[in-house]
Regions:
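N-terminal subdomain of lithium-sensitive/metallo-dependent phosphomonoesterases centered on the IMPase/IPPase/PAP
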Residues: 1-99, 293-304
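An extended, acidic
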Residues: 17, 145-147, 162-304
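Short, conserved micro-motifs enriched in small and acidic residues
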Residues: 43-51, 106-108, 205, 229-233
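Exposed regions on extracellular, virion, or secretory-pathway luminal proteins
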Residues: 70-75, 83-89, 121-125, 135-139, ...
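A broad structural signal for short, well-ordered beta-strand segments within beta-sheet-rich domains
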Residues: 72, 125-130, 198-199
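Fold-independent oxyanion-binding glycine-rich loops
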Residues: 78-80, 97-99, 135-137, 179-180, ...
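DPxDG-like acidic metal-binding loop motif
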Residues: 87-150
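Short, surface-exposed beta-strand-loop junctions and turns on beta-sheet-rich folds
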Residues: 148-149, 155-159
């Protein structure tokens, strides 16, 4: 195993993420003032995705710390699913989702984040190094190589290991977020919402932004009934290193080591095969995880 200057890598990622998030937040499209009830489905999510990818890559390569790290010059991921030739043993590769939740951004300029993972080339395979996620409100999550989760802000360099439990939900109802904003997913999530009952408040967005809310806000659980790409589950990999519970929709709880081996060390960019991460549930504790898993099983059995 080749060593990585992890602290330097995380510092470079923090600065690069700050520049990317600020670019999106300060863009002309983001600054336009809309009626809160008005949806803007004509605004292309691809525009912000592609621009953010270019900004991330440009700032990563321009960072003075990058010269001290052996990083592949091409950032790959959702907006550039092409692995460059000539990657050497020991080099670092960034897999990026530049604006995860771009459909939320398109509709309301909220509910998105910039996220991804970093892997290292090792012979014919890859080794997971870190995962990262940054939200427009400045929240920044980074995973240190020793498994400690660093939570801080993109606006300053202060980062602290996350050691306590995820914050409790102060409201009467539990809150669950599910990947159901697309029509194709609604038939999978609607029966689950029904099975959870009136004690649960259901939100129809998921992915990295929702898992970030699980760790720092009042969201109790997140589930995605669909397979996803590894850059879509960066925050899930981070959550597994905290007191949160992450597992399959069948009730199998995944350890951080399992996630690293099964998902974090695999590089698959072909759009036809890159969604190899199975459906998942993340929750603040095991009781909530089991409750959502039971609702998923009941919902699937209902045949709705």
């Amino acid at each position: 195993m080749m060593s990585v200057r992890t602290d330097l890598l995380l510092a470079v990622l923090r600065d690069t993420l700050a520049a990317t998030v600020n670019f999106i937040m300060l863009s002309t499209a983001n600054q336009e003032v809309y009626d809160p009830a008005e949806l803007h489905l004509g605004d292309s999510a691809l525009v912000v995705d592609r621009a953010a990818h270019q900004i991330f890559q440009a700032n990563l390569l321009a960072h003075p710390g990058t010269a001290k790290l052996d990083i592949v010059a091409t950032v790959v991921g959702e907006e550039h699913p092409y692995l460059p030739d000539g990657i050497r043993d020991g080099q670092l590769l960034v897999l990026l989702d530049p604006a995860d939740g771009s459909n939320q951004w398109r509709c309301q300029r909220a509910g998105w984040c910039t996220a991804g993972i970093v892997v290292q080339r090792t012979g014919d395979g890859w080794r997971f190094v870190t995962a990262f996620s940054a939200a427009p409100d400045g929240r920044l999550f980074l995973l240190r190589e020793d498994g400690a989760v660093l939570i801080g802000s993109t606006h300053n360099a202060i980062m602290a290991p996350f050691r306590g439990p995820t914050p409790p939900n102060p409201t009467k109802e539990h809150i669950v977020a599910a990947n159901a904003y697309k029509h194709a997913s609604r038939h999978l999530t609607a029966p689950v919402f029904d099975a959870l009952g009136d004690d649960w408040f259901c939100l129809t967005f998921a992915g990295n932004p929702a898992v970030m809310n699980l760790l720092t806000y009042d969201t109790d659980a997140v589930f995605n009934p669909n397979p996803s790409s590894v850059w879509d589950t960066a925050a899930v990999m981070i959550a597994a290193h905290t007191s949160a519970i992450v597992g399959s929709i069948d009730g199998e709880i995944w350890t951080p080591q399992q996630l690293d081996e099964l998902f974090g060390s695999r590089v698959e960019l072909d759009p036809a095969t890159c969604q190899f991460v199975p459906p998942y549930v993340a929750a603040k504790n095991e009781q909530l995880y089991r409750e959502v898993v039971s609702a998923i099983k009941a919902g699937l059995a209902s045949g709705s």
